[in-house]
Amino acid sequence: RVAGDDFTSDIEEYMRRQHNILIGERTAEQIKIEVGAAIDNLENPPNDYAVRGRDLMTGIPKEIHVSYKEIAHSLDKSISKIEEAILSALEMTPPELSADIYKTGIYLAGGGSMLRGLDKRISIKTKLPVHIAEDPLRAVARGTGIALKNIDNYQFLIKA
């Protein structure tokens, strides 16, 4: 399982390894929001982002600028894990559901789904249409609520 928190950790690690700068989780989260991307060829790329942190060599605070392309590179391994999990799930999908997915596409939900270009990258990998759910931050909770209200209709989804 890979989620937005993994992306944040990837960014922290990238800043430490590539720029010798120590940043906190909040700064990494802000980088993800401001310049986070899943691909390095966005049609409308964000401007570079100024990052402030502590220089690991001198211990003195410093500022650097990072591009969305750098962040896309830093997130590549985690995004590849997501792609592989999706492909694995598709391989195990019953034929009737596969037909529906082929027709309607894949829907992404959660905060990580808002990463620029993630839908495009997954679409290229799966050769299927990929959409971001309406209100992706609340989509999973809303869907779970609907399923619980109609538990008899969704009993087949519950593992014993």
What are these regions (language model features)?
Residues 74-101, 147-150:
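Phosphate/ATP-binding catalytic cores across multiple sugar-kinase/actin-like superfamilies
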Residues 4, 8, 12, 79, ...:
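Short, charged, low-complexity patches
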Residues 99-122:
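Glycine-rich phosphate-binding loops at beta-strand->alpha-helix junctions
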Residues 1-76:
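Phosphate-binding glycine-rich/basic clefts of nucleotide- and phosphate-handling proteins
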Residues 22, 50, 107, 131-132:
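Structured core elements
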Residues 120-146, 154-160:
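Conserved phosphate-binding/catalytic loops in two-lobed NTP-binding clefts
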Residues 21-25, 90-98, 154-158:
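Active-site phosphate-binding and catalytic loops of NTP-dependent enzymes
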Residues 11, 86, 108, 144:
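Residue-level signature of catalytic and energy-coupling elements of molecular machines
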